[in-house]
Amino acid sequence: MKIKFFITAFSSFLALSSFLSAGQIVISDAYARSAGPLAKAGAAYMKIMNHSDESDRLIGVQSDIAKKTELHTHLKDDNGVIRMVRIDEGIEIGSMKEHRLVRGGQHIMFMGLKEAFKTGKIIPVTLFFEIAGEVGVEIVVDQDRNEKKHSH
């Protein structure tokens, strides 16, 4: 009985861990949220650390939780209106540098959610890097998390 409990607890810890290392790329502090239970879109945020001697570039993202998953950012137009746009050129992660995907800035956008985001739900996501290749990460939904904007 104790062994079964330990295995279950350890498996849960691994699944809920917000830290993933894939070679020289380290993902930490990953979480996702949406505007509410009826939202058709959601977003994910995280820290990406590049421990290699050369810059890499996050060039894409994929998840089965939504019809479409993209890298997005917010831009202000000439009239001062802020709008969300897809990042086509990818996101550079400098050598030995950390880059944050944050609310109000660069982030992962899930459009056409296939199911509601509920706190505690695990979302499997694949990040695609030019050099590091595919990096799988399990992102935990945290609807209650509310952080201030970070600058890049």
Which stretches of residues belong to each language-model region?
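Positively charged n-region of N-terminal signal peptides that target proteins for export
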Residues: M1-F5
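Bacterial N-terminal signal peptides
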Residues: T8-S18
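Compact, glycine-rich, soluble single-domain proteins
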Residues: Q24-H152
